[in-house]
């Protein structure tokens, strides 16, 4: 049985933030990018095609893919500057990169992939927060479960080992100065979970940078389609949250058992 994997990176807005590649497999890529546009005090989420139309960009690109995404971003940067619209230039592997500042909304970016079942042993789970989980991390779980409750979904249980994995991911992003689901240290989130001895039927990850409080980061995630889908995924049963104060880096890791 194949497993489902969902990734979503929350970045601050007030600019164009480029969405990521949605994967059906490691070799077949299709793009459904979302950008957030700020002109003056107006912030809008729209598709990349709509953003191109908004800036009156003439291009022969009909379908965005991994090969021409760089060209499209360069066009956006050039024309957005002429139109007095901010553009965040990002380097990509699988997902969107962070902006430098935070605002009320985050740009959505969702990746999916199929992968063979993990063979690692299952970890112990608890219904109450372990003592190793910080107050901010507990609050993120509380706010996440409040959003799930609104939709009639079961609350997520805190998994202590998953919490360690999420915290290690946030720390790694700080230490290695990157913002991505793909870690130079641990690989993909799913490889990382496996290295921590975590097994699952389905898994996902949300990351964010710049938000100062649990309320801010959960609000940003909920205002972003990709992140919201992770938070409200009925197949997820357990959660781990990692927060690093220096840099305000946040990671949510989800699994379904």
Curated annotation (Swiss-Prot):
PANTHER family: SCP DOMAIN-CONTAINING PROTEIN. Keywords: Signal. Residues 121-134 have a biased composition (Polar residues). CDD domains: CAP_bacterial. Pfam families: CAP. Disulfide bonds: none annotated. Residues 1-26 form the signal peptide. Residues 141-254 form the SCP domain. Residues 80-135 are annotated as: Disordered. Transmembrane segments: none annotated. This is Uncharacterized protein YkwD. It comes from the Bacteria. NCBIfam families: spore_YkwD.
């Amino acid at each position: 049985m194949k497993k489902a994997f969902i990734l979503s990176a929350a970045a601050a807005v007030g600019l164009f933030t480029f969405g990521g590649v949605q994967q059906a497999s490691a070799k077949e890529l299709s793009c459904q990018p979302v950008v957030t546009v700020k002109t003056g005090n107006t912030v809008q989420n729209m598709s990349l095609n709509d953003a191109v139309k908004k800036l009156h960009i003439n291009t022969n690109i009909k379908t965005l893919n991994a090969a021409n995404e760089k060209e499209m971003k360069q066009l956006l940067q050039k024309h957005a500057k002429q139109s007095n619209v901010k553009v965040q230039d990002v380097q990509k592997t699988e997902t969107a990169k962070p902006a430098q500042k935070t605002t009320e909304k985050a740009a959505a970016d969702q990746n999916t992939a199929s992968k063979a079942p993990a063979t690692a042993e299952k970890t112990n789970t608890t219904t109450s927060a372990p003592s190793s989980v910080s107050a901010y991390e507990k609050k993120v779980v509380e706010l996440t479960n409040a959003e799930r409750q609104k939709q009639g979904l079961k609350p997520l249980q805190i998994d202590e080992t998953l919490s360690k994995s999420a915290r290690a991911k946030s720390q790694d992003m700080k230490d290695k100065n990157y913002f991505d689901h793909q870690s130079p240290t641990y690989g993909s989130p799913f490889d990382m979970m496996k290295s921590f001895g975590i097994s699952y039927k389905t898994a996902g990850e949300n990351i964010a940078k710049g938000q100062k409080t649990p309320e801010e980061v959960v609000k940003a995630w909920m205002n972003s389609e990709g992140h919201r889908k992770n938070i409200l995924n009925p197949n997820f049963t357990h959660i781990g949250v990692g927060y690093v104060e220096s840099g305000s880096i946040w990671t949510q890791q989800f699994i379904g058992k």
